[in-house]
């Protein structure tokens, strides 16, 4: 019996079970709170936590609606700290999404099931499966970015569209469409995924009530609603002109303070549109495929396999593959059941699934995934990290079809144990007896598998290691020092530590990948140096006076900064003479295309050394790899904790300073003091149960390397007992993160 037939009989109760959906969403929220991160995490988490707390601008296009929403949650007294409050926002969004999938699954099941408890059971299956899919769960317990807010927007729009499909001629139909348009525009102000549901809405309207598009007033109202929803973007040029510490893209033409003239200027418009269109990323056209489309589908399949059993260590590959096929086939069966039983809502939900799977895969046009096809190694272009979060919407929405498919199989098996004829409206249908449903219910254990299979990998409970790493790296730098970093994971956590928790704001953090932009270098000149709190500083730097600098560490005007070229050619070594009279020999670097020279970022690093060194301490994060060595500073670097300090004259060996073949000059005294009295991460890393995210494994590895090298240095100066203590801590870190192989490799060097 189709939904149309059922709907024609007035005895069928189609009222949504909002109470049951609310209970399901609440239970999902409880699960997420139980596994919630107490702090920040790797990648973009710290950037967005800090941007929300400071009402700043994260990377383009700036996600203004999320920033406003995140700021609101950051001041709500619902958790002990800012990070947890914004993480709760992510958990709440995903829990509400689960409630929406519950309602949609229940609505489809209402087309052929007479008893409400049966429909509620189907809705519960959708909520459970969707909320425990690995990527959904992992994104819901720590606010890595904006994806859970986008998810709840898409889920709400989906439910509203299903309601519209039920009564497209009703008195609320037009208002529903305008509300859908507004929420889509508001969703776009959070992330471009806000428009993901619109193609499916369009298809549903074309099929069910095509004359809607002939009503120009309604169409115009819908377009205006979308534009109105996007108005949070208007806040960007205004907020940017107040120059918050996180001001990526700097969407203002103002230089020193906000004013009407510079706010409403061509320069502001150009910078705003450059930011809005994400021009700086230079992504190739969709028609210019980075890899074959089949390989991109393979990337999605890799991440789809993760959803039902996140086998980070590859120890359950066969079980993961079997589960993936089961959940894929159940979803396809559910789609077929949806088509057969409720054609109207299918005309929305079917195109939605197509949009968030095949169409999204084609549009995103990714390279090979970081973890995809490892046998190909570096012979193929790869993303710098796994992009499973971009398919969060597909894995979450897929749960509705999986629930429908699983329920259909459950019903078929239950009918084998006996059924009864039941009146449903004007029709009579065969429905399994209650005892038959119970007899077949063990099948539903399939829906519980992701809950238990993903708990360890998805849970962030008690994880503070990212925050602790940021604390430790900042504390490795002397007061008022400049710390040079290279990318997301050694930069964004520092922003969080400084802007949210107030840890070592005196340190000037310079990210080389951002130094290639004009707005970042203007902020380097503009931002004042903040004071050092001696009482909160590490013991390694106690007993000395540290005068606060009165000017930026670089002697350039805004105009001079903007005029620095993207790169300069340099065929041979060249001397760099500092303002204090010291001379360094700078080496050209091999850049893309075999070009030898220096990038804009390299030039700014040299300008800082030229203008501020040695009165301003200069450090390179040890996550920078060989970057400072490539520049020619290798003999002038001393390892100090998690950083390498630039010195004016190569040191000499002593009881606290040794030269190690694998590390270079090593400051035993300062590093030992930091390791034993200041660092927080060794304890939190030792508590881990593995390190799931392989692309960021360099962060725990820097502790393994530091501990191993420190122990080696201590042995070299006759401090064997201290070396054993350090090595014991290092071994606990390696065991907790599952990186004992890296420790063994380090010890063999």
Q: Predicted regions: what is each one?
A:
Residues 55-61, 69-92, 97, 111-115, ...:
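Juxtamembrane segments of multi-pass membrane glycosylation machinery
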Residues 9-23:
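N-terminal membrane topogenic signal
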Residues 123-131, 184, 188:
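Short helix- or helix-capping micro-motifs
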Residues 41-51, 75-84, 134-143, 366-384, ...:
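Membrane-interface interhelical loops and short amphipathic "cap" helices
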Residues 88-116, 156-160, 329-334:
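Transmembrane-helix motifs of polytopic, lipid-linked glycan transferases
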């Amino acid at each position: 019996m189709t939904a149309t037939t059922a709907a024609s009989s007035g005895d069928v109760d189609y009222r949504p079970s909002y109470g049951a959906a609310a209970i399901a969403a609440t239970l999902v929220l409880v699960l997420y709170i139980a596994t919630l991160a107490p702090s920040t995490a790797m990648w973009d988490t710290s950037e967005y936590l800090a941007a929300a707390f400071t009402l700043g601008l994260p990377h383009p296009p700036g996600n203004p609606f999320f920033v406003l929403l995140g700021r609101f949650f950051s001041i709500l007294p619902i958790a002990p700290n800012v990070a947890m409050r914004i993480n709760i926002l992510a958990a709440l969004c995903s829990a509400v999404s689960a409630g929406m999938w519950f309602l949609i699954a229940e609505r489809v099941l209402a087309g052929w099931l007479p008893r409400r408890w049966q429909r509620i059971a189907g809705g519960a299956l959708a909520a459970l499966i969707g909320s425990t899919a690995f990527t959904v769960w992992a994104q819901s317990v720590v606010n890595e970015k904006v994806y859970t807010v986008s998810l709840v927007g898409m889920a709400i729009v989906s439910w509203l569209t299903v309601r519209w499909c039920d009564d497209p001629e009703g008195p609320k139909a037009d208002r529903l469409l305008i509300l859908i348009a507004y929420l889509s525009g508001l969703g776009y102000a959070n992330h471009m995924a806000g428009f993901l549901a619109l193609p499916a809405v369009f298809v549903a309207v074309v099929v069910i009530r095509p004359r809607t598009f002939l009503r120009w007033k309604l169409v115009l109202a819908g377009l205006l609603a979308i534009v109105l929803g996007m108005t949070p973007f208007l806040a960007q040029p205004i907020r940017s002109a107040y120059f918050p510490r996180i001001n990526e893209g700097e969407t203002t033409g103002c230089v020193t303070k906000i004013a009407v003239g510079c706010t409403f200027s061509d320069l502001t418009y150009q910078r705003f549109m450059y930011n809005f269109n994400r021009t700086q990323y230079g992504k190739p056209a969709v028609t210019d495929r980075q890899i074959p489309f089949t390989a991109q589908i393979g990337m999605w399949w890799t991440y789809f396999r993760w959803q039902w059993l996140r086998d980070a260590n590859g120890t359950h590959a066969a079980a993961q593959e079997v589960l993936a096929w089961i959940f894929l086939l159940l979803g396809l069966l559910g789609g077929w059941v949806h088509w057969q039983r409720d054609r109207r809502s299918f005309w929305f939900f079917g195109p939605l699934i197509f949009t968030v799977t095949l169409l999204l895969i084609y549009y995103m046009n990714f390279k090979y995934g970081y973890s995809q096809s490892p046998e190909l190694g570096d012979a193929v272009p790869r993303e710098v990290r796994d992009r499973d979060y971009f398919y969060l919407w597909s894995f979450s929405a897929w749960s509705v079809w999986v629930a429908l498919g699983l329920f259909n199989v459950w019903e078929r098996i239950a009918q084998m144990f006996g059924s009864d004829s039941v009146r449903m409206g004007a029709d009579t249908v065969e429905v399994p007896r209650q005892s038959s449903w119970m007899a077949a219910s063990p099948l539903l254990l399939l829906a519980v598998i992701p809950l238990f299979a993903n708990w360890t990998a998805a849970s962030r409970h008690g994880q503070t290691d990212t925050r602790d790493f940021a604390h430790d790296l900042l504390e490795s730098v002397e007061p008022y020092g400049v710390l040079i970093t290279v990318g997301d994971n050694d930069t964004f956590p520092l922003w969080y530590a400084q802007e949210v928790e107030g840890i070592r704001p005196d340190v000037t953090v310079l990210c080389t990948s951002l130094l290639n932009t004009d707005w970042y270098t203007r902020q380097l000149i503009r931002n004042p140096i903040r004071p050092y709190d001696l009482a909160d500083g590490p013991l390694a730097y106690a007993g000395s006076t540290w005068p606060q600098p009165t000017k930026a560490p670089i002697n350039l005007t805004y105009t001079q900064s903007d005029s620095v070229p993207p790169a300069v050619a340099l065929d041979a070594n060249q001397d760099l003479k500092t303002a204090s009279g010291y001379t360094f020999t700078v080496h050209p670097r091999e850049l893309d295309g075999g070009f030898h020279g220096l990038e804009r970022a390299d030039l700014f690093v040299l300008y800082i050394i030229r203008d501020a060194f040695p009165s301003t301490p200069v450090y390179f994060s040890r996550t920078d790899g060989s970057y400072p060595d490539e520049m020619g500073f290798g003999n002038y670097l001393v390892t100090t904790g998690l950083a390498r300090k630039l010195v004016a004259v190569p040191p000499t060996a002593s009881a606290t300073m040794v030269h190690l073949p694998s590390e270079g000059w090593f400051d035993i005294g300062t590093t030992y003091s930091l390791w034993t009295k200041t660092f927080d991460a060794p304890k939190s890393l030792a508590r881990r149960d593995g390190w799931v995210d392989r692309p960021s494994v360099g962060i725990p590895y820097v502790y393994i390397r530091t501990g191993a090298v420190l122990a080696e240095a201590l042995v070299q100066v006759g401090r064997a007992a201290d070396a054993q203590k350090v090595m014991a801590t290092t071994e606990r870190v390696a065991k907790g993160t599952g990186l004992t192989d890296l420790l063994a490799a380090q010890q063999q060097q």
